[in-house]
Amino acid sequence: MTDKYAFSLTTFSPNGKLVQIEYALNAVNAGVTSVGIKATDGVVLATEKKPTSELAIGASLEKVCAITPDIGMVYSGMGPDFRVLVDKSRKVAQTTYKKIYNEYPPTKILVQEIASVMQESTQSGGVRPFGVSLLVAGMDEKGPSLYQVDPSGTYFAWKATAIGKSSTAAKTFLEKRYNDELELDDAVHTAILALKETFEGELTEDNIEIAVVSTKPTDSGIVGVPGGHFCRLSQSEIRDYLDQV
């Protein structure tokens, strides 16, 4: 009976499920693990980075992307779907919202827009759900925040969470280690340790990517934009953190 609904994009099965969304979640769970942790003075996003070949240039594989100078996001799942959502998010933040209000959107507003785009693909003919889950970190007048958005368009705010293949083990680790007084530096160490719990092999600056959203504006910002709160850590900075754990 389930097979009858497996390829329908918009039809509920008798037990109330959209099977294509479950398949999209399977794509997320097949992806590498990504971790997000909210600290008292910022948010850290960390993810595994596995080149498909030893000949690939690792530095060209970016999994953490800036949406505005103060908001960044990472994914687990299908990379091409993520790129589409990054483009749509940037269009909303930097074109639509900024033209009207002359400022970038607060983190929650942007998350709601992303979630709406993802939800629409679950009820429209001729499309399929996005095969990604997102962790969105941002800084606005309310302080640092961390959200998770799933293929169904569901979103929640989190103190700390993980998505991807080893998310269950990573969440269990975070539940043991997290506390409300955690500062950003400690959060980076905790994120690395959470990935290390389930990583096959040795973590190096070449196979992990880390970005932070800090309460303090960065000197260089992103892509030359000064004063932003989002910053992707360099390989040398990641190496220093790895040496400390």
From Swiss-Prot:
This is Probable proteasome subunit alpha type-2. Keywords: Cytoplasm, Nucleus, Proteasome. The lineage of its organism: Eukaryota, Fungi, Dikarya, Ascomycota, Taphrinomycotina. It comes from Schizosaccharomyces pombe (strain 972 / ATCC 24843) (Fission yeast). It is found in: Cytoplasm; Nucleus. Pfam families: Proteasome (PF00227), Proteasome_A_N (PF10584). One of its GO terms (cellular component) is nucleus. Signal peptide: none annotated. GO terms for biological process: proteasome-mediated ubiquitin-dependent protein catabolic process. The proteasome is a multicatalytic proteinase complex which is characterized by its ability to cleave peptides with Arg, Phe, Tyr, Leu, and Glu adjacent to the leaving group at neutral or slightly basic pH. The proteasome has an ATP-dependent proteolytic activity. InterPro entries: Ntn_hydrolases_N, Proteasome_alpha, Proteasome_alpha-type, Proteasome_asu_N, Proteasome_sua/b. The 26S proteasome consists of a 20S proteasome core and two 19S regulatory subunits. The 20S proteasome core is composed of 28 subunits that are arranged in four stacked rings, resulting in a barrel-shaped structure. The two end rings are each formed by seven alpha subunits, and the two central rings are each formed by seven beta subunits. The catalytic chamber with the active sites is on the inside of the barrel. Belongs to the peptidase T1A family.
